[in-house]
Amino acid sequence: MIVTEKAPAKINLALDTPMRYLDGLPRWNMVMNAVDLADYVTVEIHHRPQTIKVYTNSGFLPNDQRNLAYQAAHILKTRFHQTDGVTIRIKKKIPVAAGLGGGSSDAAAVLRALNKAWRLGLSLDELARLSLSIDSDVPFCVYSQTAHVTGHGEIVEPLPAFPHYWVVIAKPKLSVSTPVILRQINYERLVHPQTDQLVEAIKEGKFQESFQYMGNALEAVTMEAHPEIARLKERMQKLGADVAQMSGTGPSVFALCHAESRAKRIYNSLRGFCPEVYQVVLL
């Protein structure tokens, strides 16, 4: 049986971490949204061989157990005692190591696909609970809708969807290691976005007002090591973005625009400035 799933990228409308847990991992307080930039994940189950194989069109991704999609298949195969082999083919569109959750979304897509292929009958809530051991972004990616995400990433509260907004995403030509950034956090120096106010504004349908509450507490940490991210954000702001900020731990920066003409202006201006630029919409 073959199942194909769309795996959308995510952006962080708000990203905050007020403290670390005793296990050393951050406590998250985030608002996340899927965007229409997506990988496509095709999963095939077969009796022979009984192994898990991953193939991608990207030379930057491992094809073994380090790949989050592989880990997702392994979890379901082991938990539900499935003897079938699994072949996973990932058509990458989302930039790798970009702060856009591409690997996490691929893993979530594998969970949804195998749930269908093996007829496990699991709800999205059950898949999300199983997924936390893979990565903190995977539970959100199981749902891929506007959500308030807290805890280790396992508490996902759906929020009303934004109306039609345009998003320009730009990834500078550099890589950022999330574990390195997280180790560099000085909690006494973090500037915290108004995440709770953002959540309330979204719940009340005050989407334009919500822009003032968006922010990313880790911007300063990443920008200290990579000042070109700050320059990219400033360029988006000067070009008229309603909001411009870094997604995740970077290096991607996104501009949120209510008008398509403004988004096109930013997109066209950045194409000669940045190697990877995308104009998409919020999902």
Swiss-Prot record:
It catalyses: 4-CDP-2-C-methyl-D-erythritol + ATP = 4-CDP-2-C-methyl-D-erythritol 2-phosphate + ADP + H(+). The active site is at K10, D137. One of its GO terms (biological process) is isopentenyl diphosphate biosynthetic process, methylerythritol 4-phosphate pathway. It holds the Pfam family GHMP_kinases_N. Keywords: ATP-binding, Isoprene biosynthesis, Kinase, Nucleotide-binding, Transferase. ATP binds at P95, V96, A97, A98, G99, L100, G101, G102, G103, S104, S105. Its EC number is 2.7.1.148. It is an enzyme of class 2 (transferase). One of its GO terms (molecular function) is ATP binding. Pathway: Isoprenoid biosynthesis; isopentenyl diphosphate biosynthesis via DXP pathway; isopentenyl diphosphate from 1-deoxy-D-xylulose 5-phosphate: step 3/6. NCBIfam families: ispE. Catalyzes the phosphorylation of the position 2 hydroxy group of 4-diphosphocytidyl-2C-methyl-D-erythritol. This is 4-diphosphocytidyl-2-C-methyl-D-erythritol kinase.
